[in-house]
Amino acid sequence: MSTGFFGDIQKVRYEGPESDNPLAFRHYNADEIVLGKRMEDHLRFAVAYWHSFAWEGGDPFGGRTFDRPWFSNEIDAAKLKADVAFEFFSLLGAPYYCFHDADVRPEGRNFAENTRYLNEIVDIFEKKQAETGMKLLWGTANLFSNRRYMAGAATNPDPDVFAFAAATVKTCIDATKRLGGENYVLWGGREGYETLLNTDLSRELDHMGRFLSLVVEYKHKIGFKGTILIEPKPQEPTKHQYDYDVATVYGFLKRYGLENEVKVNIEQGHAILAGHSFEHELALARTLGIFGSIDMNRNDYQSGWDTDQFPNNVPEMALAYYQVLLAGGFTTGGTNFDAKLRRQSLDSQDLLIGHIGGMDCCARGLKAAARMLEDGALSKPLDERYAGWNGEFGKRLLSGLSLDQIAGEVEAKDINPQPKSGRQEYLENIVNHYV
Protein backbone atom coordinates (compact mmCIF):
# COMPACT_ATOMS: atom_id res chain seq x y z
CA MET A 1 0.00 0.00 0.00
CA SER A 2 1.32 3.45 -0.93
CA THR A 3 2.32 5.87 1.82
CA GLY A 4 1.62 8.80 -0.48
CA PHE A 5 5.12 10.22 0.04
CA PHE A 6 6.12 9.62 -3.59
CA GLY A 7 2.79 10.73 -5.05
CA ASP A 8 1.79 8.93 -8.24
CA ILE A 9 5.33 7.94 -9.29
CA GLN A 10 5.40 4.51 -10.90
CA LYS A 11 8.07 1.81 -10.68
CA VAL A 12 11.26 2.88 -12.46
CA ARG A 13 11.77 1.02 -15.75
CA TYR A 14 14.58 0.69 -18.27
CA GLU A 15 13.72 2.78 -21.35
CA GLY A 16 17.07 2.85 -23.18
CA PRO A 17 19.67 5.51 -24.02
CA GLU A 18 17.29 7.65 -26.08
CA SER A 19 14.79 8.18 -23.25
CA ASP A 20 14.44 11.68 -21.82
CA ASN A 21 12.33 10.50 -18.87
CA PRO A 22 14.15 11.52 -15.65
CA LEU A 23 12.38 8.71 -13.80
CA ALA A 24 13.60 5.93 -16.11
CA PHE A 25 16.87 4.06 -16.52
CA ARG A 26 18.76 4.76 -19.73
CA HIS A 27 21.71 2.41 -19.17
CA TYR A 28 20.89 0.15 -16.22
CA ASN A 29 19.04 -2.87 -17.57
CA ALA A 30 18.88 -5.43 -14.75
CA ASP A 31 18.47 -8.39 -17.11
CA GLU A 32 21.15 -7.41 -19.66
CA ILE A 33 23.87 -10.06 -19.85
CA VAL A 34 27.42 -8.80 -19.25
CA LEU A 35 30.25 -11.34 -19.28
CA GLY A 36 27.72 -14.14 -18.97
CA LYS A 37 25.91 -12.70 -15.95
CA ARG A 38 22.90 -10.43 -15.43
CA MET A 39 23.81 -6.80 -14.85
CA GLU A 40 21.85 -6.82 -11.58
CA ASP A 41 23.97 -9.72 -10.35
CA HIS A 42 27.20 -7.95 -11.25
CA LEU A 43 26.35 -4.63 -9.60
CA ARG A 44 24.27 -5.80 -6.63
CA PHE A 45 22.95 -2.30 -5.91
CA ALA A 46 21.93 -1.31 -2.39
CA VAL A 47 20.19 1.75 -0.94
CA ALA A 48 21.66 3.34 2.21
CA TYR A 49 18.93 3.77 4.83
CA TRP A 50 20.83 6.53 6.68
CA HIS A 51 21.36 9.04 3.87
CA SER A 52 18.07 8.31 2.15
CA PHE A 53 15.70 8.32 5.12
CA ALA A 54 17.51 9.46 8.28
CA TRP A 55 19.55 12.45 7.06
CA GLU A 56 17.80 15.75 7.75
CA GLY A 57 19.68 17.98 5.30
CA GLY A 58 21.84 19.77 7.82
CA ASP A 59 25.43 20.94 7.50
CA PRO A 60 27.99 22.50 9.90
CA PHE A 61 26.43 25.93 9.34
CA GLY A 62 22.72 25.15 9.32
CA GLY A 63 20.14 22.69 10.53
CA ARG A 64 17.39 20.62 8.98
CA THR A 65 16.16 21.49 5.49
CA PHE A 66 14.15 18.33 4.75
CA ASP A 67 10.59 18.11 6.02
CA ARG A 68 9.88 14.41 6.47
CA PRO A 69 6.87 13.20 8.43
CA TRP A 70 8.96 10.54 10.22
CA PHE A 71 11.49 12.94 11.74
CA SER A 72 10.86 12.32 15.43
CA ASN A 73 12.31 10.01 18.06
CA GLU A 74 9.21 7.83 18.35
CA ILE A 75 8.63 4.20 17.42
CA ASP A 76 5.58 5.08 15.31
CA ALA A 77 7.74 7.46 13.26
CA ALA A 78 10.30 4.69 12.78
CA LYS A 79 7.54 2.42 11.50
CA LEU A 80 6.37 5.09 9.03
CA LYS A 81 9.98 5.50 7.90
CA ALA A 82 10.13 1.75 7.25
CA ASP A 83 6.94 1.93 5.17
CA VAL A 84 8.36 4.77 3.06
CA ALA A 85 11.76 3.08 2.72
CA PHE A 86 10.36 -0.19 1.41
CA GLU A 87 8.02 1.67 -0.93
CA PHE A 88 11.10 3.46 -2.27
CA PHE A 89 13.00 0.18 -2.65
CA SER A 90 10.13 -1.26 -4.67
CA LEU A 91 9.86 1.81 -6.91
CA LEU A 92 13.61 1.87 -7.60
CA GLY A 93 14.11 -1.86 -8.09
CA ALA A 94 17.50 -2.10 -6.38
CA PRO A 95 17.76 -5.59 -4.84
CA TYR A 96 19.45 -4.66 -1.54
CA TYR A 97 19.50 -2.14 1.29
CA CYS A 98 21.86 -1.38 4.21
CA PHE A 99 21.31 0.19 7.62
CA HIS A 100 22.77 1.24 10.98
CA ASP A 101 20.73 0.42 14.06
CA ALA A 102 20.27 4.13 14.84
CA ASP A 103 18.84 4.76 11.35
CA VAL A 104 15.88 2.49 11.88
CA ARG A 105 14.96 2.74 15.58
CA PRO A 106 14.39 5.56 18.08
CA GLU A 107 17.12 6.33 20.61
CA GLY A 108 16.09 4.64 23.84
CA ARG A 109 16.85 5.50 27.45
CA ASN A 110 19.29 2.61 27.81
CA PHE A 111 20.71 -0.46 26.09
CA ALA A 112 17.67 -2.62 26.85
CA GLU A 113 15.27 -0.12 25.31
CA ASN A 114 17.48 0.30 22.24
CA THR A 115 17.47 -3.48 21.79
CA ARG A 116 13.71 -3.70 22.19
CA TYR A 117 13.15 -0.98 19.61
CA LEU A 118 15.60 -2.60 17.18
CA ASN A 119 13.91 -5.99 17.48
CA GLU A 120 10.52 -4.38 16.90
CA ILE A 121 11.75 -2.84 13.65
CA VAL A 122 13.49 -6.05 12.58
CA ASP A 123 10.12 -7.81 12.95
CA ILE A 124 8.72 -5.30 10.44
CA PHE A 125 11.70 -5.64 8.10
CA GLU A 126 11.32 -9.42 8.05
CA LYS A 127 7.73 -9.12 6.87
CA LYS A 128 8.54 -6.44 4.31
CA GLN A 129 11.45 -8.43 2.88
CA ALA A 130 9.15 -11.42 2.45
CA GLU A 131 6.54 -9.23 0.73
CA THR A 132 8.91 -7.35 -1.59
CA GLY A 133 11.83 -9.72 -2.20
CA MET A 134 14.26 -7.10 -0.87
CA LYS A 135 17.48 -8.37 0.69
CA LEU A 136 19.89 -6.95 3.25
CA LEU A 137 23.40 -6.39 1.88
CA TRP A 138 24.78 -5.47 5.27
CA GLY A 139 23.92 -4.21 8.71
CA THR A 140 26.04 -2.20 11.11
CA ALA A 141 25.96 -0.33 14.42
CA ASN A 142 26.19 3.44 14.71
CA LEU A 143 29.07 3.82 17.16
CA PHE A 144 29.80 7.48 16.44
CA SER A 145 26.73 9.76 16.68
CA ASN A 146 25.73 9.46 20.34
CA ARG A 147 27.77 11.63 22.70
CA ARG A 148 28.86 8.54 24.66
CA TYR A 149 31.13 7.76 21.69
CA MET A 150 32.80 11.18 21.43
CA ALA A 151 36.15 9.59 22.41
CA GLY A 152 35.56 6.41 20.43
CA ALA A 153 33.80 3.10 20.95
CA ALA A 154 36.32 0.25 20.77
CA THR A 155 39.12 2.73 21.53
CA ASN A 156 37.36 4.72 24.26
CA PRO A 157 39.37 5.30 27.45
CA ASP A 158 36.28 4.27 29.47
CA PRO A 159 35.75 0.47 29.57
CA ASP A 160 32.02 1.02 30.12
CA VAL A 161 31.78 2.61 26.67
CA PHE A 162 33.70 -0.33 25.16
CA ALA A 163 31.22 -2.70 26.82
CA PHE A 164 28.15 -0.73 25.68
CA ALA A 165 29.50 -0.64 22.11
CA ALA A 166 30.31 -4.36 22.13
CA ALA A 167 26.83 -5.20 23.41
CA THR A 168 25.30 -2.98 20.72
CA VAL A 169 27.30 -4.69 17.98
CA LYS A 170 26.13 -8.05 19.29
CA THR A 171 22.49 -7.02 18.84
CA CYS A 172 23.22 -5.64 15.37
CA ILE A 173 24.93 -8.84 14.23
CA ASP A 174 21.92 -10.74 15.55
CA ALA A 175 19.61 -8.47 13.55
CA THR A 176 21.74 -8.80 10.42
CA LYS A 177 21.77 -12.60 10.66
CA ARG A 178 18.04 -12.72 11.28
CA LEU A 179 17.38 -10.62 8.16
CA GLY A 180 19.66 -12.76 5.99
CA GLY A 181 22.30 -10.05 5.71
CA GLU A 182 25.26 -11.01 3.56
CA ASN A 183 27.84 -8.89 5.39
CA TYR A 184 28.40 -7.01 8.63
CA VAL A 185 30.30 -3.70 8.49
CA LEU A 186 32.40 -1.85 11.06
CA TRP A 187 33.26 1.80 10.39
CA GLY A 188 35.45 3.46 13.00
CA GLY A 189 34.35 7.06 12.70
CA ARG A 190 35.48 7.86 16.24
CA GLU A 191 38.22 5.22 16.42
CA GLY A 192 41.14 7.62 16.29
CA TYR A 193 42.24 10.77 18.03
CA GLU A 194 42.02 14.56 18.06
CA THR A 195 45.37 15.01 19.82
CA LEU A 196 48.17 12.67 20.87
CA LEU A 197 48.43 14.61 24.14
CA ASN A 198 45.60 12.53 25.64
CA THR A 199 45.96 9.36 23.55
CA ASP A 200 47.67 6.05 24.35
CA LEU A 201 48.16 4.70 20.82
CA SER A 202 49.38 1.26 21.83
CA ARG A 203 46.49 0.68 24.22
CA GLU A 204 43.86 1.94 21.77
CA LEU A 205 45.11 -0.23 18.91
CA ASP A 206 45.14 -3.29 21.16
CA HIS A 207 41.62 -2.49 22.32
CA MET A 208 40.45 -2.16 18.73
CA GLY A 209 42.10 -5.49 17.91
CA ARG A 210 40.34 -7.10 20.87
CA PHE A 211 36.99 -5.61 19.81
CA LEU A 212 37.30 -6.92 16.26
CA SER A 213 38.39 -10.34 17.54
CA LEU A 214 35.24 -10.47 19.67
CA VAL A 215 33.13 -9.70 16.59
CA VAL A 216 34.77 -12.49 14.58
CA GLU A 217 34.45 -14.92 17.48
CA TYR A 218 30.74 -14.14 17.85
CA LYS A 219 30.16 -14.48 14.11
CA HIS A 220 31.40 -18.06 14.24
CA LYS A 221 29.62 -18.81 17.51
CA ILE A 222 26.17 -18.01 16.08
CA GLY A 223 26.87 -19.42 12.62
CA PHE A 224 26.64 -16.12 10.75
CA LYS A 225 27.82 -16.92 7.22
CA GLY A 226 28.28 -13.34 6.06
CA THR A 227 31.54 -11.45 5.64
CA ILE A 228 32.89 -9.08 8.29
CA LEU A 229 33.96 -5.83 6.62
CA ILE A 230 35.97 -2.81 7.80
CA GLU A 231 35.38 0.48 6.01
CA PRO A 232 38.57 2.59 5.82
CA LYS A 233 38.53 6.38 6.20
CA PRO A 234 41.47 8.66 7.04
CA GLN A 235 39.71 11.37 9.07
CA GLU A 236 36.38 13.10 9.63
CA PRO A 237 34.99 13.21 12.20
CA THR A 238 38.27 12.52 14.07
CA LYS A 239 41.51 14.21 13.08
CA HIS A 240 43.14 10.82 12.46
CA GLN A 241 41.36 7.48 12.17
CA TYR A 242 43.11 4.17 12.78
CA ASP A 243 41.48 2.57 9.70
CA TYR A 244 43.10 5.22 7.48
CA ASP A 245 43.13 3.34 4.16
CA VAL A 246 43.30 -0.19 2.73
CA ALA A 247 47.03 -0.56 3.40
CA THR A 248 46.63 0.56 7.01
CA VAL A 249 43.69 -1.78 7.59
CA TYR A 250 45.65 -4.70 6.13
CA GLY A 251 48.56 -4.00 8.48
CA PHE A 252 46.14 -3.85 11.40
CA LEU A 253 44.50 -7.14 10.42
CA LYS A 254 47.89 -8.85 10.04
CA ARG A 255 49.02 -7.59 13.44
CA TYR A 256 46.02 -9.14 15.17
CA GLY A 257 45.83 -12.30 13.05
CA LEU A 258 42.54 -11.36 11.37
CA GLU A 259 43.60 -11.03 7.73
CA ASN A 260 41.75 -14.23 6.79
CA GLU A 261 38.60 -13.26 8.69
CA VAL A 262 37.92 -9.66 7.67
CA LYS A 263 37.75 -7.83 4.34
CA VAL A 264 37.22 -4.19 3.39
CA ASN A 265 34.27 -2.11 2.26
CA ILE A 266 35.83 0.64 0.13
CA GLU A 267 34.15 4.02 -0.31
CA GLN A 268 35.05 6.30 -3.22
CA GLY A 269 34.92 9.43 -1.07
CA HIS A 270 37.10 7.95 1.65
CA ALA A 271 39.72 6.94 -0.92
CA ILE A 272 39.87 10.55 -2.14
CA LEU A 273 40.18 11.87 1.43
CA ALA A 274 43.14 9.51 1.95
CA GLY A 275 44.90 10.95 -1.09
CA HIS A 276 44.24 7.91 -3.29
CA SER A 277 42.17 7.19 -6.36
CA PHE A 278 39.19 4.88 -5.97
CA GLU A 279 40.76 2.31 -8.29
CA HIS A 280 43.99 2.38 -6.25
CA GLU A 281 42.18 1.26 -3.12
CA LEU A 282 40.25 -1.39 -5.05
CA ALA A 283 43.40 -2.67 -6.77
CA LEU A 284 45.32 -2.86 -3.50
CA ALA A 285 42.49 -4.67 -1.71
CA ARG A 286 42.28 -7.13 -4.60
CA THR A 287 46.04 -7.67 -4.53
CA LEU A 288 46.08 -8.22 -0.76
CA GLY A 289 43.10 -10.58 -0.89
CA ILE A 290 40.78 -8.47 1.28
CA PHE A 291 38.41 -6.95 -1.29
CA GLY A 292 34.83 -7.26 -0.09
CA SER A 293 32.36 -4.55 -1.09
CA ILE A 294 32.09 -0.90 -2.14
CA ASP A 295 30.26 2.21 -1.00
CA MET A 296 29.59 4.19 -4.15
CA ASN A 297 29.56 7.98 -4.10
CA ARG A 298 31.82 10.90 -5.00
CA ASN A 299 33.41 13.81 -3.22
CA ASP A 300 33.53 17.42 -4.27
CA TYR A 301 37.14 17.77 -5.38
CA GLN A 302 37.39 21.41 -4.31
CA SER A 303 35.90 21.41 -0.80
CA GLY A 304 38.06 18.69 0.76
CA TRP A 305 35.01 17.36 2.62
CA ASP A 306 33.41 13.95 2.48
CA THR A 307 30.39 15.26 0.55
CA ASP A 308 28.78 11.89 -0.30
CA GLN A 309 27.33 12.88 -3.67
CA PHE A 310 25.90 10.46 -6.20
CA PRO A 311 28.47 9.21 -8.75
CA ASN A 312 28.47 10.82 -12.20
CA ASN A 313 31.99 10.16 -13.53
CA VAL A 314 31.78 7.29 -16.03
CA PRO A 315 35.55 6.95 -16.69
CA GLU A 316 36.17 6.66 -12.95
CA MET A 317 33.43 4.04 -12.64
CA ALA A 318 34.90 2.10 -15.57
CA LEU A 319 38.31 1.88 -13.88
CA ALA A 320 36.68 0.98 -10.55
CA TYR A 321 34.57 -1.85 -11.96
CA TYR A 322 37.55 -3.03 -13.99
CA GLN A 323 39.25 -3.75 -10.67
CA VAL A 324 36.09 -5.40 -9.32
CA LEU A 325 35.97 -7.67 -12.38
CA LEU A 326 39.68 -8.50 -12.03
CA ALA A 327 38.88 -9.56 -8.47
CA GLY A 328 36.33 -12.02 -9.84
CA GLY A 329 33.37 -9.76 -9.10
CA PHE A 330 31.42 -9.45 -5.89
CA THR A 331 30.72 -12.51 -3.76
CA THR A 332 28.86 -11.31 -0.67
CA GLY A 333 29.56 -7.64 -1.40
CA GLY A 334 27.87 -5.16 -3.69
CA THR A 335 27.47 -1.52 -4.67
CA ASN A 336 25.91 0.44 -1.82
CA PHE A 337 24.97 4.04 -2.60
CA ASP A 338 26.45 5.83 0.39
CA ALA A 339 25.21 9.04 -1.18
CA LYS A 340 22.81 11.74 -0.09
CA LEU A 341 20.76 14.46 -1.71
CA ARG A 342 22.02 18.03 -1.66
CA ARG A 343 20.29 19.95 1.12
CA GLN A 344 18.39 22.05 -1.45
CA SER A 345 16.95 18.96 -3.18
CA LEU A 346 13.67 18.91 -1.31
CA ASP A 347 11.29 17.00 -3.57
CA SER A 348 10.56 13.33 -2.94
CA GLN A 349 11.33 12.49 -6.57
CA ASP A 350 14.86 13.91 -6.12
CA LEU A 351 15.70 10.80 -4.09
CA LEU A 352 14.72 8.56 -6.99
CA ILE A 353 16.46 10.74 -9.57
CA GLY A 354 19.73 10.69 -7.61
CA HIS A 355 19.73 6.89 -7.41
CA ILE A 356 18.67 6.48 -11.05
CA GLY A 357 21.56 8.65 -12.21
CA GLY A 358 24.01 6.78 -10.01
CA MET A 359 22.80 3.39 -11.21
CA ASP A 360 23.03 4.47 -14.85
CA CYS A 361 26.55 5.79 -14.29
CA CYS A 362 27.65 2.53 -12.69
CA ALA A 363 26.02 0.50 -15.48
CA ARG A 364 27.96 2.45 -18.10
CA GLY A 365 31.16 1.96 -16.13
CA LEU A 366 30.55 -1.78 -15.77
CA LYS A 367 29.90 -2.24 -19.49
CA ALA A 368 33.02 -0.29 -20.42
CA ALA A 369 35.08 -2.31 -17.93
CA ALA A 370 33.70 -5.57 -19.30
CA ARG A 371 34.60 -4.61 -22.88
CA MET A 372 38.13 -3.65 -21.85
CA LEU A 373 38.50 -6.97 -20.07
CA GLU A 374 37.10 -9.02 -22.96
CA ASP A 375 39.33 -7.28 -25.51
CA GLY A 376 42.46 -7.42 -23.38
CA ALA A 377 42.70 -3.68 -23.97
CA LEU A 378 44.69 -3.04 -20.81
CA SER A 379 45.93 -6.54 -19.96
CA LYS A 380 47.84 -7.04 -23.23
CA PRO A 381 49.99 -3.89 -22.85
CA LEU A 382 50.52 -4.83 -19.20
CA ASP A 383 51.72 -8.31 -20.14
CA GLU A 384 54.12 -6.79 -22.67
CA ARG A 385 55.49 -4.37 -20.08
CA TYR A 386 56.42 -7.21 -17.70
CA ALA A 387 57.28 -9.83 -20.33
CA GLY A 388 60.95 -9.94 -19.33
CA TRP A 389 60.06 -11.50 -16.01
CA ASN A 390 58.65 -14.53 -17.82
CA GLY A 391 62.04 -15.26 -19.36
CA GLU A 392 64.72 -17.52 -17.94
CA PHE A 393 66.77 -14.71 -16.37
CA GLY A 394 63.71 -13.04 -14.85
CA LYS A 395 62.61 -16.29 -13.22
CA ARG A 396 66.11 -16.91 -11.82
CA LEU A 397 66.16 -13.42 -10.31
CA LEU A 398 63.03 -14.25 -8.33
CA SER A 399 63.83 -17.79 -7.25
CA GLY A 400 67.45 -18.69 -6.90
CA LEU A 401 70.13 -16.11 -7.55
CA SER A 402 71.81 -14.44 -4.57
CA LEU A 403 72.78 -10.78 -4.54
CA ASP A 404 76.44 -11.52 -5.32
CA GLN A 405 75.46 -13.92 -8.12
CA ILE A 406 73.25 -11.24 -9.66
CA ALA A 407 76.13 -8.77 -9.48
CA GLY A 408 78.40 -11.33 -11.16
CA GLU A 409 75.96 -11.85 -14.05
CA VAL A 410 75.47 -8.12 -14.57
CA GLU A 411 79.24 -7.70 -14.90
CA ALA A 412 79.87 -10.85 -16.95
CA LYS A 413 77.06 -10.16 -19.45
CA ASP A 414 77.66 -6.40 -19.47
CA ILE A 415 73.98 -5.81 -18.67
CA ASN A 416 73.29 -2.13 -19.32
CA PRO A 417 69.49 -1.68 -19.61
CA GLN A 418 67.89 1.24 -21.41
CA PRO A 419 64.51 2.64 -20.31
CA LYS A 420 61.33 1.87 -22.24
CA SER A 421 58.22 3.99 -22.61
CA GLY A 422 55.46 3.48 -20.05
CA ARG A 423 52.94 4.54 -22.74
CA GLN A 424 50.65 6.26 -20.23
CA GLU A 425 49.01 8.56 -22.78
CA TYR A 426 48.30 5.60 -25.06
CA LEU A 427 46.66 3.68 -22.22
CA GLU A 428 44.60 6.69 -21.14
CA ASN A 429 43.37 7.03 -24.71
CA ILE A 430 42.38 3.36 -24.69
CA VAL A 431 40.20 3.96 -21.63
CA ASN A 432 38.63 7.01 -23.28
CA HIS A 433 37.86 4.90 -26.34
CA TYR A 434 35.82 2.45 -24.24
CA VAL A 435 33.90 4.98 -22.17
Curated annotation (Swiss-Prot):
Any one GO MF term held by the record is: magnesium ion binding
Which cofactors does this protein require?
Mg(2+)
Record localization: Cytoplasm
What keywords are assigned to this protein? Carbohydrate metabolism, Cytoplasm, Isomerase, Magnesium, Metal-binding, Xylose metabolism
Q: How is the cofactor bound?
A: Binds 2 magnesium ions per subunit.
Please list the coiled coil stretches.
none
Cellular component terms, GO, for this chain's entry? cytoplasm
The reply on keyword Transmembrane is no
Which residues does the record give as Mg(2+) 2 binding sites? E267, H270, D306, D308
Q: What are the catalytic residues?
A: H100, D103
Subunit structure of this chain's protein: Homotetramer.
Q: Which family does it belong to?
A: Belongs to the xylose isomerase family.
Q: Which protein, by its recorded name, is this?
A: Xylose isomerase
User: What is the organism field in this record?
Assistant: Brucella suis biovar 1 (strain 1330)
